[in-house]
């Protein structure tokens, strides 16, 4: 029997936002879970890994002098495979994995690993992306660094640190700006890395049912957010889609938009299909799988969420409308 895939949390955030402090808090908490940590540092000599509370981590793997968001994603796959192999042999025990990215990482390609690689998907399940936001410096970072925008736009949770260093008005303005970039991610204030475990682990960010339960406004396609250069929009329809037309449109859109599309996810109803189909896309990789049958008491409604850099929203909405069954 195949083991249940281990949940994975991607912990990201710009330089100095407090990721390692948060990770130490999680490792010290008495939650009873064994955590394997993959620590990515953009330097030959790892410093952050030396600051991690080692007794709380089952295994710490350090990836030095590289950024897992770009050229060495293959190294990440090899590390994950090694962790899974050692667990299967009884050499290592862990319940979940936390990947702490470098502050300069775009989390989208990291998440893509768990969508595109079949062996990784069989052994690991991406639970969510948690982004730390430095309240004192986030405004400047969002203005000057595309990576900071991507980290906020891709998040399933936004944890705001250093709020004690700014005034109430400045904090309120930042939270408003963050909602503009990513209205779907709940925001939490974190003091000295002390976050609720449920805000970091088991966020179920890639579980569409969980999203619908947590955020009933997720269904509302009136919400459109285009601030900074990262934005999101939601498309919904009670009319079923034509499968061939939608697949062709999505393939063309992902080819045209490319890496500007950070993430898409959704639940789709197709004409003539009793299955509820789940779409997950990260950059140029798209998967679609029948999740289960639509329930008789369930409203058959398609909901698609798109997050990306300068997305052509109106053109995409029109394209999606043309994919509806006639």
Predicted segments, located by residue:
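Non-catalytic interfacial helical region
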Residues: 109-119, 133-148, 152, 160, ...
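Nucleotide-state-sensitive switch-loop elements of NTP-binding domains
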Residues: 2-17, 21-141
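Residue-level signal for alpha-helical context at structural boundaries
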Residues: 40-41, 56, 94, 128, ...
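Short glycine-centered, acidic/aromatic-flanked micro-motifs in structured strand/loop junctions
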Residues: 13, 25, 101, 161-162, ...
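C-terminal accessory "lid"/substrate-recognition subdomains
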Residues: 2, 150, 154-302, 309-326
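A generic "cationic amphipathic patch" detector
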Residues: 28, 35-36, 89, 110, ...
């Amino acid at each position: 029997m195949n083991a249940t895939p281990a949940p994975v949390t991607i912990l990201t955030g710009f330089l100095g936002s407090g990721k390692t402090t948060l990770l130490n808090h999680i490792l010290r908490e008495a939650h009873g879970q064994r955590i394997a940590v993959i620590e990515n540092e953009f330097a030959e000599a790892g410093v952050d890994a030396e600051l991690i509370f080692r007794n709380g981590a089952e295994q710490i793997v350090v990836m030095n002098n590289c950024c897992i968001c770009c050229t060495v994603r293959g190294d990440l796959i090899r590390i994950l495979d090694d962790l899974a192999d050692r667990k299967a042999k009884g050499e290592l025990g862990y319940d979940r994995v936390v990947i702490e990215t470098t502050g300069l990482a775009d989390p989208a390609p990291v998440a893509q690993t768990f969508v595109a690689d079949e062996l990784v998907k069989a052994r690991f399940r991406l639970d969510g992306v948690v982004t730390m936001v430095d309240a004192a410096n986030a405004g400047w970072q969002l203005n000057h660094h595309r990576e900071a925008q991507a980290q906020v736009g891709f998040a399933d949770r936004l944890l705001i640190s250093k709020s004690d260093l700014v005034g109430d008005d400045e904090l309120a303005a930042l939270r408003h700006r963050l909602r503009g970039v990513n209205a779907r991610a709940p925001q939490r204030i974190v003091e000295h890395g002390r976050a609720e475990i449920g805000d970091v682990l088991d966020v179920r960010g890639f579980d569409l049912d969980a999203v619908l339960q947590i955020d009933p406004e997720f269904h509302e396609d009136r919400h459109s957010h285009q601030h900074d250069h990262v934005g999101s929009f939601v498309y919904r329809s009670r009319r079923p889609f034509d499968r061939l037309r939608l697949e062709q449109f999505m393939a063309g859109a992902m080819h045209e938009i490319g890496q500007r599309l950070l993430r898409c996810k959704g639940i789709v109803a197709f004409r003539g299909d009793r299955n509820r189909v789940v779409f997950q896309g990260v950059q140029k990789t798209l998967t679609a799988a029948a999740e289960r049958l639509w329930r008789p008491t369930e409203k058959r409604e398609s909901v698609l969420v798109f997050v990306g850099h300068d997305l052509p929203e109106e053109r995409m909405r029109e394209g999606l409308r043309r994919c509806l069954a006639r």
